[in-house]
Amino acid sequence: MSKIRVLSVDDSALMRQIMTEIINSHSDMEMVATAPDPLVARDLIKKFNPDVLTLDVEMPRMDGLDFLEKLMRLRPMPVVMVSSLTGKGSEVTLRALELGAIDFVTKPQLGIREGMLAYSEMIAEKVRTAAKASLAAHKPLSAPTTLKAGPLLSSEKLIAIGASTGGTEAIRHVLQPLPLSSPALLITQHMPPGFTRSFADRLNKLCQIGVKEAEDGERVLPGHAYIAPGDRHMELARSGANYQIKIHDGPAVNRHRPSVDVLFHSVAKQAGRNAVGVILTGMGNDGAAGMLAMRQAGAWTLAQNEASCVVFGMPREAINMGGVCEVVDLSQVSQQMLAKISAGQAIRI
């Protein structure tokens, strides 16, 4: 089997050296070239035809975003962004994902060599995922038109969504058309700390419903979406007659914190047939067991189809486990989940 050919673009010689060490330490990939800036990278891409590009977000001569935008228009290829953990870094990274980057890794703020080498397995996994990702499914999505929701007969109704690789854009596409009369949404997207707040703020500006990073103990309200904070689990809990959010630092589940399974299991327990579960694009199996629990509790469950997924991992696992009632294209997810909530449809198996 041929190795995954990687090209790294970073203005830091140290980062280029570290990325080369990491990539070449894995037998299924190789660093074919490195470039100090996008202008040099342009020629190296033509020469080496890499399978995956790792790209620093902030660089001299040509901004990483400008280069990414041109690259995706002229020669689309899988890109993993390398980002700082700053507020500006998270905003730029979210814009990069919007432009077509598959995923991102964050630079540690202190001890870059030790920190990056500690992330070696994670970086390799993201490169492998990017190499297999569907670029066709990652074309920039046009803003969907606003949907009409049926009357929300009960504040007990809610929607739980889980996603990973490719999920930031998929979630945007699902939330943007939702009207203010939508039920509450609880969302777990695999993301590091700091990025989830920027992600929520970005969505809040684009959507009619309110979108925010979830806080421990807050009441769950219709017309609002709550994003699990990075590196913390989010669960649905009850306080008397009302739903509320529980945020905690439990151990990683399926190697993830926040974990989709943690959210889905709590929704199965607290909301049962009043919930709709949605699993979107992502690598791995997080959410599959939780979605089965939701379906067994009477919830209607949806999975994004393979054709519209950047990575058809999590939906496939949920389908194979028997937890999915319906498989739909990303363009139909918003409409279908509102229809099921309004109709009060649920299924028991």
From Swiss-Prot:
PROSITE patterns: CHEB, RESPONSE_REGULATORY. Residues 5-122 form the Response regulatory domain. GO terms for cellular component: cytoplasm. The active site is at S164, H190, D286. Pfam families: CheB_methylest, Response_reg. It is an enzyme of class 3 (hydrolase). InterPro entries: CheB-like, CheB_C, CheY-like_superfamily, Sig_transdc_resp-reg_Me-estase, Sig_transdc_resp-reg_receiver. The modification 4-aspartylphosphate is found at D56. It is found in: Cytoplasm. Keywords: Chemotaxis, Cytoplasm, Hydrolase, Phosphoprotein. Its EC number is 3.1.1.61, 3.5.1.44. SUPFAM superfamilies: CheY-like, Methylesterase CheB, C-terminal domain. One of its GO terms (molecular function) is phosphorelay response regulator activity. GO terms for biological process: chemotaxis. Contains a C-terminal catalytic domain, and an N-terminal region which modulates catalytic activity. Involved in chemotaxis. Part of a chemotaxis signal transduction system that modulates chemotaxis in response to various stimuli. Catalyzes the demethylation of specific methylglutamate residues introduced into the chemoreceptors (methyl-accepting chemotaxis proteins or MCP) by CheR. Also mediates the irreversible deamidation of specific glutamine residues to glutamic acid. HAMAP family: CheB_chemtxs. Belongs to the CheB family. This is Protein-glutamate methylesterase/protein-glutamine glutaminase. It comes from Shigella sonnei (strain Ss046). The gene is cheB.
